[in-house]
């Protein structure tokens, strides 16, 4: 049994809605959502936005394109799945990747249906999902389920306030915890109890902060929150470190620096997430 107790998070994609690479997003990143989490020798991935392609490239170069991991989806809006067909390890039939989604109950398609009949299906995409199915299993679960992945890894799930549904995650390992709370919209006048439960006493929380409070009224009902709400959750839940996430495509590096400065003046343990950054938990 390994003595490795590493617990770390890497941001492979921090942007929301649509990838926006270019000279104005070099610092905070232009790829859409993808998290890589290491718990000892185990690897967990959350979401498959465009950032997952770079993760796959690393696995291909360093691990002979073999992957044994659990991949959890917060939901299946395009910015959270669009990188999946470009994730190289899935095309290795020796890989063992367990895909999980908890937001599709009662909807027309299950996870495999979305991937096989909508995402990886001509004329939208020329490579059929059959080419990844040998490496993958597909698990639709009811949001609220608790996963015991073994090796001391517990993953708790909770419903988020987002169109078509979404699930947040709390990863617990070696006495520490990480909360992933995106995509979600706050409730005006009260804090979201589901989010508070996921974030309770977390060592690290990642929270949907697409907008500022000033911008939010124009986007009410779109399923996203603000950095000001992130700080309220962090304070109420006694979160140790908070990363603002799902950066709006219109927020270039200059604007993100302004937000970072405003946030730091209020809470020194909170700041915007940066693509490529690794965080020890």
PLM regions with names:
Residues 177, 185-275:
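Cap/insert and terminal regions of metallo-dependent hydrolase folds
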């Amino acid at each position: 049994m390994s003595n490795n107790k590493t617990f770390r998070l890497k941001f492979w994609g921090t942007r929301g809605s649509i990838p926006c690479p270019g000279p104005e997003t070099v610092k905070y990143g232009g790829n859409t959502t993808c998290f890589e989490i290491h718990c000892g020798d185990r690897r967990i991935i959350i979401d498959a936005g465009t950032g997952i392609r770079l993760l796959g490239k690393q696995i291909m170069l360093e691990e002979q394109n073999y992957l044994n991991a659990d991949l959890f989806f917060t939901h299946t809006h395009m910015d959270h799945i669009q990188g999946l067909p470009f994730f190289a390890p899935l095309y290795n039939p020796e890989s063992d990747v367990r895909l999980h989604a908890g937001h599709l109950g009662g909807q027309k398609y299950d996870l495999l249906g979305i991937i096989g009949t909508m995402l990886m299906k001509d004329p939208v995409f020329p490579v059929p999902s059959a080419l990844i199915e040998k490496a993958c299993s597909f698990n639709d679960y009811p949001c609220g389920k608790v996963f015991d992945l073994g090796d001391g890894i517990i993953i708790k799930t909770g419903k988020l306030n987002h169109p078509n549904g979404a699930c947040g995650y709390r990863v617990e390992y070696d006495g520490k915890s990480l909360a992933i709370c995106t995509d979600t919209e706050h409730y005006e006048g009260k804090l979201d109890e589901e989010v508070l439960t996921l974030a309770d006493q977390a060592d690290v929380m990642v929270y949907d902060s697409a907008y500022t409070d000033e911008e939010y009224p124009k986007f009410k009902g779109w399923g996203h929150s603000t950095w000001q709400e992130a700080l309220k959750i962090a304070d109420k839940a006694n979160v140790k470190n908070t990363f603002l996430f799902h950066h709006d495509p219109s927020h270039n590096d200059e604007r993100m620096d302004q937000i970072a400065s405003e946030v730091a003046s209020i809470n020194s343990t909170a700041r915007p997430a940066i693509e490529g950054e690794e965080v020890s938990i």
